[in-house]
């Protein structure tokens, strides 16, 4: 879905009109978060958002998976497979499955580590464990009570923050902020903006870690694209961040087109972009997540990979190691 503009401005007529509905939605969401869930039998680390849309969860999952492997763990991702038609549980096969089957994010992640898609998260736990998981990484699901979490890391974009701070549909929040803050174990702030500073101060005041991080583009791809004029397009939570990252890398963005998050590209849309790039002598560039939905055109579109780097990796490592130790201590008979 494409987020309405009033979600990211000062309180407006639109948001005020929707506040009664938001109050009802928020009350239901808060009550749902209080339910008990399945104990997975292995530590569960959840990477989530307070709000709808993207903020950098997928790069965070990849960074955590890398760290967990360094710690000697076998992480397996558990996802609902948003945008895919398979209810699961199913292990994602990057050769056999398409984004329309399992969702674009799980398909992209499956190129790096084992991923299980299950519309009902609890049903996916046995399959994740069957893949040898010593740790389950939940991609999203912070507000879901289906599986007991041993650590919840919340990702916030430092430029966007929490928008107008209202609960859906008056704003972007998935539930009232207070109960979400109480269930947060660590905050990951992506970028150098100030929009998340107030939330960071509240989390820090609770004695919980605030982890600063930034997206780092692939140096080889940046070198390849410098000197070229590009036509950039993206159907992610915040396409503007992608376009700005290209420009900050010294790449000339001669044209850009933004689509809604998880946009199901039509053949006509892609052929139109390819034709425009050809006419204007531009290189067509998109995100890795978008390219997962565009396999048939992968030879004509250049992906722009990014990784998440933490400013204080030792702090992240200590947090994760401590959480794993405590989780296993609780699960011992």
List each language-model region with its residue ranges.
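Phosphate/Mg2+-binding loops and adjacent switch elements
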Residues: 81-83, 87-206
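A secondary-structure boundary/capping signal
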Residues: 46-49, 138, 169, 287
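ATP-dependent carboxylate-amine ligase
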Residues: 1-3, 11, 70-71, 147-333
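Rossmann-fold NAD(P)-dependent oxidoreductase module
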Residues: 63-67, 139, 245
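Walker A (P-loop) phosphate-binding motif
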Residues: 30-97
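A transmembrane-helix-recognition feature enriched in membrane-embedded lipid enzymes
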Residues: 1-44
């Amino acid at each position: 879905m494409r987020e309405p503009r009033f979600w990211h401005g000062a309180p407006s007529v639109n948001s005020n009109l929707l506040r009664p509905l938001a109050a009802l939605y928020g009350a239901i969401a808060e009550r749902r978060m209080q339910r008990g869930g399945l104990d997975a039998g292995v530590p569960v680390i959840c990477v989530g958002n307070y709000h709808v849309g993207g903020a950098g969860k997928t790069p965070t999952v990849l960074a955590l998976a890398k760290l967990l492997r360094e710690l000697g763990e076998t992480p397996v991702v558990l996802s609902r497979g948003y945008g895919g038609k398979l209810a699961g549980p199913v292990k994602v096969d990057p050769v056999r499955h398409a984004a329309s089957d399992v969702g674009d994010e799980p398909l992209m992640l499956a190129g790096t580590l084992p991923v299980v898609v299950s519309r009902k998260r609890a049903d996916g736990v046995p399959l994740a464990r069957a893949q040898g998981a010593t740790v389950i990484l939940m991609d999203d699901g912070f507000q879901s009570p289906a599986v007991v979490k041993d650590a919840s890391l919340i990702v916030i974009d430092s430029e966007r923050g929490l928008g107008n701070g209202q609960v859906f549909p008056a704003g972007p929040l998935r539930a009232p902020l207070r109960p979400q803050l109480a269930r947060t174990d660590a905050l990951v702030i992506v970028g150098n903006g100030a929009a998340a500073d107030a939330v960071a101060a509240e989390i820090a005041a609770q004695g919980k870690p605030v982890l600063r991080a930034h997206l780092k583009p692939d140096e080889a791809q940046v070198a390849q694209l410098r000197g070229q004029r590009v036509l950039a397009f993206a159907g992610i939570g915040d396409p503007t961040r992608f376009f700005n990252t290209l420009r900050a890398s010294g790449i000339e963005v001669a044209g850009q087109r933004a689509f809604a998050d998880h946009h199901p590209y039509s053949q006509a849309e892609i052929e139109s972009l390819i034709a425009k790039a050809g006419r204007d002598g531009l290189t067509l560039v998109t995100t890795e997540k978008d390219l997962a939905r565009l396999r048939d055109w992968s030879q004509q579109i250049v992906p722009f990979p990014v990784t998440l780097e933490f400013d204080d990796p030792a702090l992240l490592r200590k947090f994760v190691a401590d959480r794993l130790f405590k989780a296993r201590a609780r699960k011992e008979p």
